[in-house]
Amino acid sequence: FGLAFAVALPLFAQQKPAYLDAAKPIEERVEDALKRLTIEEKVAMLHAQSKFSSPGVPRLGIPEFWMTDGPHGIRPEVLWDEWDQAGWTNDSCVAFPALTCLAATWNPDMSMLYGKSIGEEARYRNKTVLLGPGVNIYRTPLNGRNFEYMGEDPYLASRMVVPYVQGVQQNGVAACVKHYALNNQEINRHTTNVIVDDRALYEIYLPAFKAAVQEGKTWSIMGAYN
């Protein structure tokens, strides 16, 4: 029996799909999973099944994933397909200071602790993705969401976003850096045609996203609305 068990172990290891093998590079795992998905399954995973969730693929052991707002607090539970709160009597969350306050500290260690703390709460609530942090640069003072972002300085935002992302993802929760890119106002945000020259784009509006991806290793990015 012992010999048969010893032989079976390497056979099982060989049969284990690459996408389930945590020891393999993420690129290889993703490619392997994509090859196994049907068109219908791919479309379903890219489409929401509720306000804050998308379906998984049970036959491949891929779970559905659940998202929650940040960037400065976990959103209380909402109804399945509505924005109204679900009204759970035991539902509460920590309201963290806005990211503009965090950025004003110029303290990367504080940013790491902030991200770690909010990531812990997201994990406790069984969330897969935290919809934050936001790093859109302050272009106009009339943007009502400026308080959600890390200031008007691309260097400051670049230094503060990295530890935030790392702190969140220490908990196995994906940070979703937003909104890529040039989503710097809320007025007519679904129809605005943003015109920007290359120098402004690469020196002002993209550095924080670049740092989040290359240094912070963020697991997801949210597209802009413009």
How should each PLM-predicted stretch be described?
Residues 1-10:
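Bacterial N-terminal signal peptides
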Residues 13-226:
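Glycoside hydrolase catalytic-domain context in secreted enzymes
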